[in-house]
Swiss-Prot record:
It comes from Buchnera aphidicola subsp. Acyrthosiphon pisum (strain 5A). Keywords: ATP-binding, Cytoplasm, Glycolysis, Kinase, Nucleotide-binding, Transferase. Pathway: Carbohydrate degradation; glycolysis; pyruvate from D-glyceraldehyde 3-phosphate: step 2/5. This is Phosphoglycerate kinase. ATP binds at residues 198, 314, 340-343. It is found in: Cytoplasm. Its EC number is 2.7.2.3. It catalyses: (2R)-3-phosphoglycerate + ATP = (2R)-3-phospho-glyceroyl phosphate + ADP. One of its GO terms (molecular function) is ADP binding. The keyword Plastid does not apply. It is an enzyme of class 2 (transferase). Substrate binds at residues 21-23, 36, 59-62, 114, 147. Belongs to the phosphoglycerate kinase family. Monomer.
Length: 390
């Protein structure tokens, strides 16, 4: 992989367009988690230090393309930036496609890219307009790097210089460290509701990790190979595929589970073995014996890759498995990498973000990189380097 890095370029007084990932949860105009903003700051701060003319763009949520929707406006992030960069002139622009004038050391935050018609379909005219805004394009949104859209991919065809920002490089380096030459033993923890969405990830990780621990609805599909699991969430169509994986690789499934009769916050948990689950019961978390076994595996590991909770952690009585796994990873001296939306929510819930070696900002991009897919944004950077270096 040959791409330019922002750190290798002279960006002083240049117009720098940074595609950040500022897709943060906002309720009633208040940012609920600034994790992605904090991850984006080093690239922005470097550009300011170098006295660049800094233009920042991002998407937020899933608005109807081409239409302004207040709920999805980046204005709350503009307010956040004003406090963060209180000694810097910063502008908010919702009418930027015909150009922006900035002085060195100033910032312009652009309105939601998805308000622009053609963004999602990688429209060439829109991509060209983006490219006209800058001298150098910096792709720093790892969380959107699997999207072939105008602001993440199409712009690379027209801009003279496209490069990777600090966050994108750190994401790639951390994932390569875990996937290419991991310290042994390596354990991968894969939770979530569906095997179908993570089958390729499981297949890939099974060839790399020494042990795979499955949780949530994914684990239920593996349990359904041998047991009747009541009304638990699982995918009947993937039981055969799950069996092929289990028979070939070292995949750990729960030996006991916390079950309940109703999917609700205050439901009482009962611990049962998988051969004793009634028709009106559903699995919602690991049992204590499973937790002990998994803690032992994690404690002995030198590399830990974690994607997804292993139970319904939003319900207090079905949180223990996810909580104990999270805290065990946090207390480990192993190299740990965590990614995926729900995983980040767990990390926030238990306040362990400073105890994980690397927290990926990517959800779909995180999984696709693990699968070995070529991410469109990385492909764009490679093609720009190759074509513009001739």
């Amino acid at each position: 992989m040959t791409i330019r890095k922002m750190t290798e370029l002279n960006i002083t007084e240049k117009r720098i367009l940074i595609r950040s990932d500022l897709n943060v949860p906002i309720e009633n105009g208040i940012i609920q988690s600034d994790a992605r903003i904090l991850a984006a700051l080093p690239t922005i701060e470097l550009a300011l230090q170098k006295k660049a003319k800094v233009i920042i763009m991002s998407h937020l949520g899933r608005p109807k393309e081409g239409y302004y929707t207040k709920k999805y406006s980046l204005f709350p992030i503009f307010e956040y930036f004003k406090k963060k960069f209180n000694n810097t002139k910063i502008y908010f622009s919702n009418n930027f496609l015909d150009g922006i004038k900035l002085n060195p050391g100033e910032i312009a935050l652009l309105e939601n890219t998805r308000f622009n018609k053609g963004e999602l379909n990688n429209d060439e005219q829109l991509s060209k307009k983006y490219s006209d805004l800058c001298d150098i394009f910096v792709m720093d949104a790892f969380g959107s790097s699997h999207r072939m859209q105008s602001s993440t991919y199409g712009i690379g065809k027209f801009v003279k210089i496209a490069c990777a920002g600090l966050l994108l490089i750190s994401e790639i380096d951390a994932l390569k460290k875990a996937l290419k030459k991991p310290k042994r033993p390596m354990v991968a923890i894969v939770g979530g509701s569906k095997v179908s969405t993570k089958f390729n990830v499981l297949n890939k990780l099974s060839k790399i990790a020494d042990t795979i621990i499955v949780g949530g609805g994914i684990a239920n599909t593996f349990l359904a190979i041998d047991y009747k699991i009541g009304k638990s969430l699982y995918e009947p169509d993937f039981v055969f595929e799950a069996k092929k994986l289990r028979d070939k690789y070292n995949i750990i499934v729960p030996i006991d589970s916390r079950v309940g009769k109703n999917f609700c916050k205050n439901e009482q948990a009962i611990i049962k073995s998988p051969d004793n689950i009634k028709e009106d019961e559903e699995i919602m978390d690991f049992g204590d014996e499973s937790i002990k076994k998994i803690i032992s595996i994690i404690t002995q590991s030198q590399t830990i890759m974690w994607n997804g909770p292993v139970g319904v952690f939003e319900f207090p009585n079905f949180r223990k498995g996810t909580e104990m796994i999270a805290k065990t990873i946090a207390n480990s001296n192993a190299f740990s990498i965590a990614g995926g939306g729900d995983t980040l929510s767990v990390i926030d819930m238990f306040n362990i973000k400073n105890n994980i070696s690397y927290i990926s900002t990517g959800g779909g991009a995180f999984l696709e990189f693990i699968e070995g897919k070529k991410l469109p944004a990385i492909q764009m950077l490679e093609e720009n380097f190759k074509n513009k270096s001739k």
